[in-house]
């Protein structure tokens, strides 16, 4: 299941709750074409990687999180372990998204 996070406090709580698990964060917007294109694939990865926490953040609804995480374009994927960012990339690249997850779990 992909969790939607709407503010910075919830985002930080999710990172803390995940502990040592990998957290994959999708920063997107409803008006972003590439974001819409990759969203079903992002959701499908939940089934493939059961021990990974998946979070989606709408940058328009959660501007505080986008600013805190220094998101400049959409979609941006950030990867966290133990509350710290370990990887990041921008763009709707399905192969890169899956390969990055595989390399970090």
UniProtKB/Swiss-Prot annotation:
Gene Ontology biological process terms from the UniProt entry: positive regulation of DNA binding; response to radiation
Record note on modification: May be nitrosylated on several cysteine residues, depending on the oxidation state. Nitrosylated Cys-73 may serve as donor for nitrosylation of target proteins.
Keywords, alphabetical: Activator, Cytoplasm, Disulfide bond, Electron transport, Nucleus, Redox-active center, S-nitrosylation, Secreted, Transcription, Transcription regulation, Transport
Annotated Gene3D superfamilies: Glutaredoxin
S-nitrosocysteine: residues carrying this PTM: 69, 73
Domain of life: Eukaryota
Cystine pairings recorded for this chain: 32-35
CDD domains with a match to the protein in the record: TRX_family
Entry protein name: Thioredoxin
